[in-house]
């Protein structure tokens, strides 16, 4: 720490302030840990996703084969894929439980309205990550689920038809749909989620945790 302090003056005070920041006594229960557990699942998703990206091939011809290779041939591949799969399921559940806790305790009220909005965006991003990742194995179930998702998007007023074409890569389902979902899943959506997470935690830090009901 001294070495860092010499090169970045003040970093020691920042680290000490973060480490020694008092936590209200009413937050010392599992219901106030749901947000942190959601973040933990997101970190697991990122780490296991990087490992899976080493072997995954986002083409219609090779996608399913590469997933099978990860599961059956790569050392610990089945474990890593299972961790990615189940941490996704758990993250979605925890996001909903976290938002229910925030709503029940009134933590979304003034002056924390913007943090609630950021949390709503994070919920949408979590669902979008789950949806885009579902197509990547490119099996029958995931393929038709994605087609249904595109048709559902088509029902949106004004932007629906355009959004469907953007998702599918054309009037009909094309190979570009897989590559677009892959880019969304591994690059765009995680980057946007990280931005909202940083904003979310900064607002928590500045505004503090809400008082008990």
From Swiss-Prot:
The chain crosses the membrane at residues 30-50, 88-108, 114-134, 184-204. GO terms for molecular function: electron transporter, transferring electrons within cytochrome b6/f complex of photosystem II activity; metal ion binding; oxidoreductase activity. It comes from the Bacteria. It is a multi-pass membrane protein. It is found in: Cell membrane. The keyword Phosphoprotein does not apply. Belongs to the cytochrome b family. PetB subfamily. NCBIfam families: cytb_ExtP. This is Cytochrome b6. The gene is petB.
